[in-house]
């Protein structure tokens, strides 16, 4: 194992390994753990949940033993975890890991968390439980595509980048418009114009992005992985969550890709084949959103995740001195 890279004391290194779902982030991260004393900080809004292992592709017990991992299995599925909580946790962990003489390795694909950490949190209105309940009721009566059409009337920019069934994001955009009287896209644009960022531009961040040279090949990989999850007992996992009695499809945990589709299957809203198709399609949509976020990250160094030597390329870019 090599020593920690020699960066300026003012800029101790933080390596970020970003990529869409099924891009091979775990394998690359574990390879980096063989090169330097890293501690892995999960950048994944689904891995925070306990009792959700198969559908989140959570690292195995053996993989978790290779290096210290953080922000995995930290909250109950009945609870929520925000970008603000992630930033607070990640900043604390980065300091603690550096104090131990180790390298923080941030690994994942929840780009909202990455942007919040490196660019700061936005000042959008806080969630309003009563308004969300009202929107949920409206969606139950008319369907999320109808609410997507409503959003298109007041915030066409945001609506254009959201799928008609992207319930969580449609709800948030409508909520922001109702509370502020302004489109979310306009608020975000103004904040971006007035903000000066120190985060990702800081020399301490080494940002490596795993991106596919062939989107179709990654789509095939996503389908194979979803089928493997089903074979491993994904449906049984969701059945156990349902049996608790305190969870429902409106929770962020159950809105995670794959879980919502299996929940609908268990509710009798879809047959097995339809559930499988919807789960794969939702995962591909997630992948598309992740890649869109990544490509708006100019500080990244890109590695083709389909290349046979992609792990070696990641190791070279991480620059641990080997």
Swiss-Prot record:
Keywords: ATP-binding, Magnesium, Nucleotide-binding, Transferase, tRNA processing. Transmembrane segments: none annotated. The record marks 110, 132 as: Interaction with substrate tRNA. It catalyses: adenosine(37) in tRNA + dimethylallyl diphosphate = N(6)-dimethylallyladenosine(37) in tRNA + diphosphate. It is an enzyme of class 2 (transferase). InterPro entries: Dimethylallyltransferase (IPR039657), IPT (IPR018022), P-loop_NTPase (IPR027417). GO terms for molecular function: ATP binding; tRNA dimethylallyltransferase activity. GO terms for biological process: tRNA modification. Belongs to the IPP transferase family. Monomer. Catalyzes the transfer of a dimethylallyl group onto the adenine at position 37 in tRNAs that read codons beginning with uridine, leading to the formation of N6-(dimethylallyl)adenosine (i(6)A). This is tRNA dimethylallyltransferase. It comes from Cupriavidus taiwanensis (strain DSM 17343 / BCRC 17206 / CCUG 44338 / CIP 107171 / LMG 19424 / R1).
């Amino acid at each position: 194992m090599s020593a920690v890279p020699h960066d300026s004391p003012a800029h101790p290194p933080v390596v970020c390994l970003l990529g869409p779902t099924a891009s091979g982030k775990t394998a690359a991260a574990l390879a980096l753990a063989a090169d330097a004393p890293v501690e892995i900080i999960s950048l994944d809004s689904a891995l925070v949940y306990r009792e959700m292992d198969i559908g989140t592709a959570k690292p195995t017990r053996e993989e978790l033993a290779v290096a210290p991992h953080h922000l995995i299995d930290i909250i109950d599925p009945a609870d929520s975890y925000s970008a603000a909580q992630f930033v607070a946790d990640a900043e604390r962990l980065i300091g603690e890991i550096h104090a131990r003489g180790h390298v923080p390795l941030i690994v994942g694909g929840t780009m909202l968390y990455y942007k919040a950490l490196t660019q700061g949190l936005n000042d959008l209105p806080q969630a309003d439980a009563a308004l969300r309940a009202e929107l949920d009721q409206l969606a139950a009566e008319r369907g999320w595509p109808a609410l997507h059409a409503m959003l298109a009337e007041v915030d066409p920019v945001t609506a254009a980048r959201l799928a008609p069934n992207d319930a969580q994001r449609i709800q948030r955009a409508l909520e922001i418009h109702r509370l502020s009287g302004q489109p979310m896209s306009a608020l975000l644009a103004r904040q971006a114009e007035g903000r000066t960022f120190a985060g990702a531009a800081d020399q301490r961040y080494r940002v490596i992005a795993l991106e596919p040279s062939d989107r179709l090949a990654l789509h095939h990989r996503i389908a194979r992985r979803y089928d493997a999850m089903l074979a491993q007992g994904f449906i049984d996992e969701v059945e156990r969550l349902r049996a608790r009695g305190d969870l429902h499809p409106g929770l962020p945990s159950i809105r995670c890709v794959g879980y919502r589709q299996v929940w609908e299957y268990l509710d009798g809203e879809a047959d097995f084949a339809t559930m499988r198709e919807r789960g794969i399609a939702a995962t591909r949509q997630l992948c598309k959103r992740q890649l869109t976020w990544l490509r708006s990250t100019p500080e990244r160094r890109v590695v083709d995740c389909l290349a046979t030597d992609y792990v070696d390329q990641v190791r070279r870019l991480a620059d641990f001195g080997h």
